[in-house]
Amino acid sequence: MDKKYLISTNYEIDSLSNFEKKVASHLSDSSKIFNYDELIKNTKFFKKKNTLKSKKHCKRLTNKIFNQLYFHITQDTKSVISKKAYSIILIPFLNIFIETIYEKFIQYNKVVLRNKKLTLMLLNKKNFIYFKNFAEFISLSQNDLFNLQLVSEIIYFNKYSNNKKIIENRKLKTFFKKTKNYFFERFNQISKTNYSYINKKKDLNSSIAMFKIDFRHDIFLKEFLKYKVPLKKNLNKKFFEKFNLIEVKQDNDLREKILYKLKSNLKIENFIFKMAIKYLPSLYFESISMNLENIENNIVNVPKFLISNAHGWWTDDKFKFYAAICIKNKTKYFDVQHNGTYFMIDKNPHFMISKYFRDYFIGWGSACEQDKYSIKLPVLYNVNNQSTKIKNNFTNKNHKIIFMGASIKRYFGGYFQSYLTGGNSFLYYHSQYQFINNLSKNIRKNLILRLRHNNRDPRGYIDYLKRNFKGLKYEDIKISAASRLTDNNVKIIVVDHCSTPWLEALQANKPIILFWSKSENSINKKYLPLINILKKYKIYFECPIAAANRLEEISKKNIKWWYKDKNIQKLRKKILDLFFYNNSKPVKLWNEKIKKIYYGKF
């Protein structure tokens, strides 16, 4: 009898015969080639269930592991570092790693327990690869070989009774290591040492330091730095060149000791504990003390305020160690919003994680003010309101339709709140394809796609689009959305996901169509009435076919209808005030608000 294999990545497929490939069972769409006709025959998409429950469970596990690691750092090495300071180094990595392997465990275990006849494919442990830091993990999390490795960890841990096939490919491992070494920074590695950290208190200087608030904010930074009271400085790449991070080899005895203390009655928790301790880069544990002192030896003092956002530093280890020193010495850290999912999506991950170490949060609109020490300041994206310009200058040349798509990860990459996190992206592709498929040829010829898909993606979605819709135009996304949406020839904007583009489109004030699945995005219940109003005014749709029909309808209208509809304009202003607040003097407002906090008047 032929074996039926469970496939989790593209990597396993090459080792199967044509018949085995045909009958194989796929863990998710990550190992499949996109085909719309096949999808509509089988509409059983992977649905997100209890995502916030899983999120809360992962947070509890994050806290439990973090507390154990912090205890040993302060007790065994006598490091003088606060929990708040250590959290900016460790929590961003730890939380995402836990959510990623948690999701993988739940998904794989569920499939295997349903069918004991499946033959499981796994890597030989000798072929396992390991990451040195958070940046490497983010890259590996979307790699076939590493995802097969995580699946293999689950198989080894659970000891399933299913038949198994072990895959070996040392050549690929060697090639991958060389590739990894080429792209990622190497650290100086030293053996385990009985190192004693000597705390060196740093004085606060009078400055406000800013680091990579966002590459779209360059104009703002230039103007903001002109305000000399309070004094401001921009931390550039050169500032961090003097910091050389050291990697101490793992202390396996200490890690075993910590793992013993993390025992649980739940199998999934024991798996998470084991993986977190096993894969934790020594940079974030054994190497902490030496690197803290290394940073301290290279700075004279620390700023009074430090302002940045996750877009700028999330995987930047040098910044995180520097920020930890600053926080340890009483610097106030300001976290800045960097995308449009904050607050609209329930419990935005970046917002929740930064609670561990931030003092203040700067948000794009009044929605942020629900949280203590959150400040509403103008968004710094340069998208201009086009209403007056278009109403006075509309011609028949304004006929282009911009479609703004999302980047959907192939594998789940942490964060349960939205399909934007990846893992089963065919749901998203299916919806997008349905929309395009239900447009007339006349509309399609005016449609311009701004998609962030990788052309080398093995799922073949872009190639599928190009084969089936030969007249479609694709735009270089290097041109900023801010510039593109304000072009005279753009008449209508379509957005199929709930991140920043829908807010940019509303600010541009051109007719807009939104469609995304409410069931696949954990929308904050507080704003569900807002979604219903958008539905009422035929702006928001859950069904892509209904959205396509609406586009056909409004494309025939003179654009002035959008501006004459007082209800739409009123709703638009309300949404922008909540999530995308704009002001004619943003730099001045930023300086005034931060100045008040600086002088204790907030």
What spans do the regions from the language model cover?
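Catalytic-core helical/loop segments in enzymes performing group transfer/polymerization on anionic/lipid-linked
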Residues: M1-F602
